[in-house]
Swiss-Prot record:
The active site is at residues 70, 265. GO terms for molecular function: oligosaccharide reducing-end xylanase activity. This is Reducing-end xylose-releasing exo-oligoxylanase Rex8A. It is an enzyme of class 3 (hydrolase).
Amino acid sequence: MNITGKGAYDTGTYANLFQRSGYREDEIKARLEQTWNDLFYGDEHTRIYYPVGDDKGYMLDTGNDDVRSEGMSYGMMMAVQMDKKHEFDRLWNYAYTYMQHTEGRYKDYFAWHCKPDGTRLSPGPAPDGEEFFAMALFFASNRWGDGPAPYDYQAQARKILHACLHQGEQGEGDPMWEPSNRLIKFIPELPFSDPSYHLPHFYELFAQYANEQDRTFWKEAAEASRAYLRTACHPVTGLSPEYANYDGTPAPVQLHGDFRHFYSDAYRVAANVALDWEWFRKDPWQVQQSNRIQAFFSDIDVSDYRRYTIEGEPFNEPALHPVGLLATNAMASLAADGPDADSFVKRFWNTPLRQGKRRYYDNCLYFFTMLALSGNYRVY
């Protein structure tokens, strides 16, 4: 692993770890295309994308039978990375039409989940959706150019990010980033964070693409999030809690559950850290962190993945999304230079998409890892 020098953003060269592990370019390309086809147009046990009418579509959270801003924005990122404008525009039109608020305390934010018919189930937003929507829209603008509203991608992305930083300044509502420390919040109203929401590699790009007045903020947010992740990830195990205070310590138990431990949301941290390293190579800690989390899981079979304390103590409770956890552990190989990096790439390659009721979250993470390890999760 190249732990010196520049990231892919500067070099234009993205590591193809599948190829490095001995797989042929033609089989890698075929596998990526097949994975897209299975997720978007496969059988009812595998697919998570559903077109609606002439111009909309949604990503279904199959475990909860709803549509989430997380999944919609993930689907858009998948589509722009794969150069699939048709599906991208359908997803965006659905989110824009049914999920994005046009007034009130959540203006320009997205309701975090709704029914497949577009009926909102909760008005409040989940900020990981907004940041993925904005990044996917900027990439779409740069890949395909802008069209008439709502397909004026750049303007739509800037509108979202403006709300994220300035909501409440002229009226009701709260920003999604805490102005005093530049950290993303779990939800706008609460003073703590979710480590898996921290995407410094996105904020580096927001610092170039967002409204000019906010570019310094985004640059500072990238640095703040990198520093935050160093406090939120355990120094021995590499595990992080689902929710954490601004100092990185696990957040208190919430009315809706105990999120102090390493569980579903937290899996994404390993993937985010590794992609930030691949794109920008700004924090050598990310290499050691990736080695740590791979070392922790190196001798644990996927069938035995559990919920863990961040110190590494397993609960009896099995992981709800074991394939998703394997995927993010494998994506850590983008940054890892330890003895487990290659074996995780191969374990992932030999693991199929998840089928059945709980497949949505696993397979979203799976697809991002398929993109990343084939050198196709790129900056546009």
